[in-house]
Swiss-Prot record:
Family annotation (SUPFAM superfamilies): Ribosomal protein L36 (SSF57840)
Any one GO CC term of the record: ribonucleoprotein complex
Encoding gene, per UniProt annotation: rpmJ
Matching InterPro entries: Ribosomal_bL36, Ribosomal_bL36_sp, Ribosomal_L36_bact
GO biological process, alphabetically ordered: translation
Keywords: Ribonucleoprotein, Ribosomal protein
Protein name (record): Large ribosomal subunit protein bL36
Domain of life: Bacteria
Species annotation: Granulibacter bethesdensis (strain ATCC BAA-1260 / CGDNIH1)
Length: 41
């Protein structure tokens, strides 16, 4: 999982990427390609 300041570039890497909020943190997850994960902060 990458930790990034901005998730905009992480979101557009793949069309299956979704932005979700968990426990006050923002994550990018991808069910089809689980390697495409990122967290903001």
């Amino acid at each position: 999982m990458k930790i990034r300041n901005s998730l905009k570039s992480a979101k557009v890497r793949d069309k299956n990427c979704r932005v979700v909020r968990r426990h006050g943190r923002v994550y990018v997850i991808n069910k089809k390609n689980p390697r495409m994960k990122a967290r903001q902060g």
